[in-house]
């Protein structure tokens, strides 16, 4: 179980309140598919993923990125219970979709990069550390059913 201090919770929620879920989600998932091209195999139904511009402009990538980031919003609301929050999604990704759980960690790291780019100096080392802890906790919760 991940424990967040009051300061970490504030750092996470203060940034989250300013996140454009649609834009940031699409960019994070798009970057994942570009930077780690082997992750594309889980998105065969998304159509053209042949280049960075095709991926970043793909409406299905953007829509799924929004969906992913919307679920991350549930983590922000339930920082003290990530495992239960992601129990059903963990089961889906493990049993039905067979997603490599390492991809959750990779996507979390890419999301932190996207947030740093968007928030610049506001994304201080302390804020970065809190978000890194969050995405690691979410990745662990999503990987739970694999163990």
From Swiss-Prot:
Sorted UniProt keywords: Heme, Iron, Metal-binding, Oxygen transport, Phosphoprotein, Transport
CDD domains: Hb-beta-like
Gene3D superfamilies: Globins (1.10.490.10)
Annotated positions of the Phosphoserine modification: 14, 51
Binding site for heme b: 64, 93
Name of the coding gene: HBE1
Record-given protein name: Hemoglobin subunit epsilon
A Gene Ontology molecular function term of the record: oxygen binding
Family that this chain belongs to: Belongs to the globin family.
Role according to the record: Hemoglobin epsilon chain is an embryonic-type beta-type chain found in prenatal and neonatal marsupials.
